[in-house]
């Protein structure tokens, strides 16, 4: 029995020493946090801009990448008239709009009580006189008809172009406020038809000629080179009627406004205008 006990004690002691002799377990390594190649991109800020279909919406779409690089996701809302883009901006449904020139904007603010401001010139679209039933201005007959835009500032612009071509003469000192009532001389007794701007191209089959806004001429597939006459690029009209980026008063210095203006006045925008429109749209910056 004593011998058995001794053997057991010997085994226990041997096991104890073996356990003590085992190396301490190495501390568990803490896994390093996984890293990605680059930080997740910041979420783009949505910016909503109202525009005429051509060329404004097309120009905006051409600079989407410029805005994306600046942190903005551009949404272009297309309009086919000259009223809704301003009322939508006034009501806060848009962040900006791009379709009009300053005289039209000022006239709209005065008549509608809106609070919209221009923040920069983008481009100029020369008005053109396009052939309808008559293919030459000198051939327009006595009592012939010419269609012009029916909104205030664009009507004046059309009348100034007709005057520059010797078809009518306006009253003394009447320029950008001219209406058909300000025609002082009309040698051929022409019938001047006031038509909604968007419908002018469609009216060509019914009149001898029409004075058409640049964007609607482009939209109708009319080429500047085919116009019977256009505004001179160095004329006061070219400067006065440059199309502008517009925001609601108080938002002129918003970061989104600055980013929009920078994109629309970029080399990308200018190159797009030159290549796409072949003289029908001219950068104004």
Give, region by region, the residue ranges found by the protein language model.
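Short helix-initiation/N-cap motifs at beta->coil->alpha
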Residues: 76-87, 175-202
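Periplasmic-binding protein-like
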Residues: 154-163, 264-284
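Bacterial lipoprotein signal-peptidase II cleavage site
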Residues: 16-31
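A conserved helix-loop-strand patch within extracytoplasmic ligand-binding domains
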Residues: 119-168, 270
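Alpha-to-beta junction loops
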Residues: 90-100, 144, 167, 188-191, ...
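A bilobed periplasmic-binding-protein/Venus flytrap-type ligand-binding module shared by bacterial periplasmic
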Residues: 126-137, 241-254
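Ligand-binding "clamshell"
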Residues: 107-119, 134, 206, 211, ...
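Short, well-ordered beta-strand elements
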Residues: 42-54, 72-78, 145-146
